[in-house]
Amino acid sequence: MKEMCMHYKSRLTEEMADIKAYMDMSCELKKSGNDLEAQILKDIAKDESTHAKHLIHILEKNDYNMEDTENALHVMLAEYKL
């Protein structure tokens, strides 16, 4: 199970990076007037945030302290208004 949890932690890092990348692209598209494309990328970022929350939950169930990561995710989501 430890190996699987390490995979989940790695995946969580990737999910958080993906959220940032999608939101950065969304902001750039919005500035260019591409509102539909910007909204699509924002929706994808929301999906990624759901995945990240699920991974945090799984890791917490396996006795990993994810408080700092969970707080960082909440700050990121608030910053992007997701």
Tell what function each PLM region has.
Residues 1-82:
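Non-heme di-metal
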